[in-house]
Amino acid sequence: MKQLLNTLFVTSEDIYLSLDGENVVASREQQAAARYPLHTLSGIISFAYPGASPALMGACAQRGVSLAFCTPRGRFLARVCGESNGNVLLRRTQYRTADDPAQSCRMARSMIFGKLYNARWSVERTRRDHGLRIDGARLEQASARIKALLPLVAEETSLDALRGLEGTGATAYFSVLDEMILGEKPVFSFPGRSRRPPLDPVNAMLSFSYSLLAHDCAAALESVGLDAYVGFLHRDRPGRSSLALDLMEELRPCMADRFVLTLINNRIVKRADFTYRENGAVLLSASARRSVLKHWQERKRESLTHPYLGEQLSWGMVPYIQALLLARTLREDLDAYPPFLWK
């Protein structure tokens, strides 16, 4: 099984990355600030503008270390990829499946089922654990609305209709997300989803966490030989990792959303951790990004029992396991893709 190595996050905006022997060197004003052995890293995510040296990019490509560049706000810019893993037959099958609406719908159906299942379970978990602190009736209604969609998703044969069901479920889920935030109101109130730019602290953290999850999903797909840019639910768009977005759908509620709720409800983040721009945008401060990244890595090391495999593994391995199951489904080793159903 793949070993879960470390991910290096570069959050200082003036850091330049280079290669010295077998080490990644982080430099500020041409002075080495830190060194990291390359063999201990599975990925590097830079939120800095200076960039990285061609030598480091080449070494990462050769060794399968994912190197991604994001803006300081967390918006994905680019990723350095080396030679594709796996054989060409798997990718040919992926492309044929993506070009076939019926087969695409079969794959997307499982992913959306997983997303709505996990969204409902997240709501139910809040009802169970914090019944005296929430509006239980509202959460029960939202849970029932999402539950009613699951059999419809399981039988749907149209991609457009499937997207409509997903949207209906997302509306029900986000309508009660504010109830799942247990403290620090009104700073951490959730009026609804906003992006590009996020307009409140909760949306700022959601967008940042989704960027991290998308990177992990893209790296996982590439590691098993799939093309992260050709999806089944999300269609082709230049520069968009469509299959990574597909894969992360089922993981959003349990990996990203619950992570954000934990940060808020455990008072790990505060109002002072955000900057408020004149255009209404709300962004995580540099120190807050470092704190969020630290807790993200800690969360990925926590263990769980995989619902399909029945094996103990870390949360950080979940995208890799799901990517592997997706590849096995495309090879017809499995009859259908088994989504991650959080329990």
Residue ranges of each PLM-predicted region?
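A surface-exposed, charged beta-strand/loop segment in the N-terminal or early-internal portion
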Residues: 40, 48-121
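Active-site helix-to-loop segments that bind/position phosphate- or nucleotide-bearing substrates
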Residues: 1-20, 29, 35, 87-343
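Terminal-proximal segments
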Residues: 1-72, 82
